[in-house]
Amino acid sequence: MANQPIDLLMQPKWRVIDQSSLGPLFDAKQSFAMDDTLCMSVGKGVSPATARSWVHHDTIVLGIQDTRLPFLQDGISLLESEGYRVIVRNSGGLAVVLDDGVLNISLIFEDEKKGIDIDKGYEAMVELMRRMLRPYNAKIEAYEIEGSYCPGSYDLSINGKKFAGISQRRVRGGVAVQIYLCADKSGSERADLIRRFYQAALKDKQNDKKGVYPEIRPETMASLSELLQKDISVQDLMFALLTELKALSTHLYSAGLSIDEEMEFEKNLVRMAERNAKVFG
């Protein structure tokens, strides 16, 4: 059982699945189906701990709570008019922005005998981010940033401005700890898009829904490039990820899905498609 965040990160083997450069046709529904698939195989002990990196172009990922917005379709129409695809993920939380300047990382562990408490999974991801960003001498803090989109206790920030958010999903004995990292472009412009989405989807009900949906202040969010005043790309973060995972394990290797995993993935993708069809018709 892991006692410290570093214990979770130090694995005999790390399997890596890199989906960070699949391009605009890579649909975000595939990503959430993929993580559920990997949770199953890691949870069963068929696969070692797995790190999956993923990038989706111009996509807004809604949480289940967002589907209860009173004027949801108006909000979706606004996002689509800005050129974004909209999907609903299979877990809680609230809306986030994905584009080609945002790197997502999923760490998938076996939850052996329920040995990984929720905080430990989050703290392992925080520790990995601190290691990845150590060369930039940045002081990274983990606490909720009010005014950001999809706020949570493990928002990552520098000087009070959020650049990353962490979530967690548990499926069939596996734990997927997921982070989105805003590498470049404007963090405040991403936040303003979500602010306008909630305005359109709430209209005159904003006061009724205070505390349910965030009142977004775009100035609370920024990209790493903005915060560190350096050009930091998704590729730079990918290199840092692989470097740290290699240092934390005796064997780092890349592997696609097995035949069994492919079959499970197809089932999970159908479930994701059905979930989205219920919301979007």
Swiss-Prot record:
Root EC class: transferase
BPL/LPL catalytic domain segment(s): 45-253
Entry superkingdom: Bacteria
Impact noted for substituting residue 150 to A/S: Loss of catalytic activity. Unable to form an octanoyl-enzyme intermediate
Residues annotated as catalytic: 150
EC number: 2.3.1.204
One family name in Pfam for this protein: LplA-B_cat
Inactivation phenotype: Cells lacking this gene are unable to grow in minimal medium. Addition of lipoic acid only partially restores growth of the mutant strain but the double mutant strain lacking both lipL and lplJ fails to grow in minimal medium containing lipoic acid. Moreover, the lipL mutant cells grow as well as wild-type in minimal medium supplemented with acetate and BCFA precursors.
Further information: The reaction proceeds via a thioester-linked acyl-enzyme intermediate.
Family: Belongs to the octanoyltransferase LipL family.
Protein name as annotated: Octanoyl-[GcvH]:protein N-octanoyltransferase
